[in-house]
């Protein structure tokens, strides 16, 4: 099975070390463009663009990278409860059309009550997933070309429709990650690819089996992906030394503050990440070559595969054997590590190198009439 390898655009900051200004660098448009172009040339399938108040806006960043890349896809966040599904569907179709079919979407429900409150969202965990399920139903139906009337608990639309369809049919693929039962049920019923953070293989296997069974109950099959950091070097010793350097400027106070911030979230996935290290710096290799040091201060994906190219490739193939076909990777700093992964890891894997998409012809059209429909040629009798 050929593997889809994704990289990451660090719109929330970048540098050589975690938890310090030492070795940091400005993350401006030029730098993000360098990373995107490197990923494009090296054969990555796409890039994940993060979302949240600590990040630049993912949609604007993605749009700005379209003209400077050729085949790279952009995995961009959809935010239920923050955005109308109708507006989000129009945005998704436009991004897909402007990128010539290079748009992918990642459903992000949110987990930090403080950040959500700042965005005007005051739903609890179960309510957010109810809203996300309704959002996704409407979003998908619009992209499928339906005129949608929907009267749910959280979402209400009447006569919603898209005038301009996406390039990808039936619609651009939808990714999603969540560890709770309600999250897995949402994935099983509505998404195309289920993402997990980088837990040890036995825990990932358990999650995949759960989601696969739930999808089968809905008569569906879905794909699987995993989100990991990577520290790959020419030798295993060099890789482990690089891992230690990455957290060499962390102090106990910084770790404690980060863990306290993570503790206020209601994310089951974040709780599982924190349990891998319990905020302690010892015993961070939680599974062969799987290192939890990143999660001491970084929310979300908190584990890294560490080793030389063949070693990391072996660990990736272990995950692939569980049914995972997509790997969303990152490393610090992201420009240099994009090259290291491409040069030291890719030769040891069966990597699916994306082709440059051919321009898709769009039907000629006149201006929309009354902001309601596209004029069509009337058949002559």
Swiss-Prot record:
Keywords: Flavoprotein, FMN, Monooxygenase, Oxidoreductase
NCBIfam families, sorted: alk_sulf_monoox (TIGR03565), PRK00719.1 (NF001939)
Function: Catalyzes the desulfonation of aliphatic sulfonates.
Keyword Cell cycle: no
Quaternary structure and interacting proteins, as annotated: Homotetramer.
Positions in coiled-coil regions: none
The protein, known as: Alkanesulfonate monooxygenase
Organism field: Escherichia coli O139:H28 (strain E24377A / ETEC)
Family: Belongs to the SsuD family.
EC category name: oxidoreductase
Reactions it catalyzes: an alkanesulfonate + FMNH2 + O2 = an aldehyde + FMN + sulfite + H2O + 2 H(+)
Pfam families hit by this protein: Bac_luciferase (PF00296)
InterPro entries according to UniProt: Alkanesulphonate_mOase_FMN-dep (IPR019911), Luciferase-like_dom (IPR011251), Luciferase-like_sf (IPR036661), SsuD_RutA_monooxygenase (IPR050172)
UniProt GO MF annotations: alkanesulfonate monooxygenase activity
Note: FMNH(2) which is absolutely required for this enzymatic reaction, is provided by SsuE.
GO biological process: alkanesulfonate catabolic process
EC number: 1.14.14.5
The keyword Flavoprotein belongs to this UniProt entry's keyword annotation: yes
């Amino acid at each position: 099975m050929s593997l889809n390898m994704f990289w990451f655009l660090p719109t929330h900051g970048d540098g050589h070390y975690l938890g310090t200004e030492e070795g940091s660098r400005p993350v401006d448009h030029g730098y993000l463009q360098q990373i995107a172009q490197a990923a494009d040339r090296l054969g990555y399938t796409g890039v994940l663009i993060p979302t949240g108040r600590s990040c630049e806006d993912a949609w604007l960043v993605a749009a700005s990278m379209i003209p400077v890349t050729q085949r790279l896809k952009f995995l961009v966040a959809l935010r239920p409860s923050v955005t109308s599904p109708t507006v989000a569907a129009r945005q998704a179709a436009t991004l897909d059309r402007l990128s010539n079919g290079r748009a992918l979407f990642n459903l992000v429900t949110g987990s930090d009550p403080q950040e959500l409150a700042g965005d005007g969202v005051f739903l609890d965990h179960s309510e957010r997933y109810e809203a996300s399920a309704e959002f996704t139903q409407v979003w998908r139906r619009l992209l499928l070309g339906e005129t949608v009337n929907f009267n749910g608990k959280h979402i209400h639309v009447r006569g919603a429709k898209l005038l301009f369809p996406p390039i990808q049919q039936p619609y651009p693929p939808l990714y999603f990650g969540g560890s709770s039962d309600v999250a897995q049920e949402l994935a099983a019923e509505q998404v195309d690819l289920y993402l997990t953070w980088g837990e040890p293989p036995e825990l990932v296997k358990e999650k995949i089996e759960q989601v696969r069974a739930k999808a089968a109950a809905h008569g569906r099959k879905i794909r699987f992906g995993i989100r990991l950091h990577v520290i790959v070097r020419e030798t295993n010793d060099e890789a482990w030394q690089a891992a230690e350097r990455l957290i060499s400027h962390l102090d106990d106070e910084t770790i404690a503050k980060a863990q306290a911030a993570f503790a206020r979230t209601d994310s089951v996935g974040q709780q599982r990440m924190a349990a891998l290290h319990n905020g302690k710096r010892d015993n961070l290799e939680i599974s062969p070559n799987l290192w939890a040091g990143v999660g001491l201060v970084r929310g979300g994906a908190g584990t890294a595969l560490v080793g030389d190219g063949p070693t990391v490739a072996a660990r990736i193939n272990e995950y692939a054997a569980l049914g995972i076909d997509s790997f969303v990777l990152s490393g610090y700093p992201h420009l240099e590590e994009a090259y290291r992964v491409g040069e030291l890891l890719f030769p040891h894997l069966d990597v699916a190198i994306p082709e440059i998409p051919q321009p898709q012809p769009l039907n000629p059209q006149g201006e929309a009439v009354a902001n309601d429909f596209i004029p069509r040629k009337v058949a002559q009798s």
